[in-house]
Amino acid sequence: MFEINVDPVAFSIGSLVVKWYGIMMALGVVALVSWIFWRIKRGANISYDTVLTAAIIAIPSGIVFAKLLHVIDAWEYYSLNPGAIFSGEGLTIFGAIIGATIGLWIYSRYSHFNLGYLLDVAVPGILLGQAIGRVGCLLNGCCYGEFGGTGCSVIYTNPATAAPYGVEVAPTQAYEIIFLLCLLTFSLFIAKKLRPDGQLFLLYISLYAAWRVAIGFVRVNDDFALGLEQAQVVGLILMAVAVPLFIYRLRKQKQTDKIT
């Protein structure tokens, strides 16, 4: 068992309260953009201007959808506290991914850049950014797992924590950090074997969605539909879309390779 006694609030300036969660989310975005810039420096066929504009579009569209899914999931709370809709907390990663992807797709229609290529380049950065963001969840005490004393558990002892105070819970945030870093390593290896047309991004979506469906049985969340939490439902939908698309593109690549 591990003890976490961290105040979720990193610092405050007057009425402005800055939490570790927000800091880690911001660092995750910085890590993602920095990764893409590094890839450009190493020869990736994307312009800096395209990436900057893409970030300006993807970040707000991702935040809007991340909040939207959480509002849908916790409508009873938000209907009684409408002002909380505009808070910086309560963001869903699937909403962020979907929103950012939609925003980038619209942008690509006007700018005519290769969206699949950009997404493939971004995948390792996305995974690194997610892992950093989950550190914020771990410090904040949100997104925790089942109660009870297991071989690997954490107990939050700061009164301001978002987790149940003084209760042993499964550190599902830490589990996900480890998974994301493993998937990051795998993505760096497998990227060399895939055509940069969106295949790596589809594989990432498929594997991460499968992970969220699995870890959802350990995490503590309200049921959304069919006895599953919202992330599990969304994960199943994303798998139903991403897996067939990935297989189709992979087969198409193999057929093309045989011809050439």
From Swiss-Prot:
InterPro entries in alphabetical order: Lgt
GO terms of biological process kind: lipoprotein biosynthetic process
Keywords, alphabetical: Cell membrane, Membrane, Transferase, Transmembrane, Transmembrane helix
Membrane topology listed for this record: Multi-pass membrane protein
Pathway recorded for this protein: Protein modification; lipoprotein biosynthesis (diacylglyceryl transfer)
UniProt binding sites for a 1,2-diacyl-sn-glycero-3-phospho-(1'-sn-glycerol): R134
Classification via Pfam families: LGT (PF01790)
Principal location class: membrane
Gene Ontology molecular function: phosphatidylglycerol-prolipoprotein diacylglyceryl transferase activity
EC id: 2.5.1.145
Subcellular location per the Swiss-Prot or TrEMBL entry: Cell membrane
Superkingdom of source: Bacteria
An example Gene Ontology CC term for this record: plasma membrane
Family note: Belongs to the Lgt family.
Protein name listed in UniProt: Phosphatidylglycerol--prolipoprotein diacylglyceryl transferase
Organism for this UniProt entry: Dehalococcoides mccartyi (strain ATCC BAA-2100 / JCM 16839 / KCTC 5957 / BAV1)
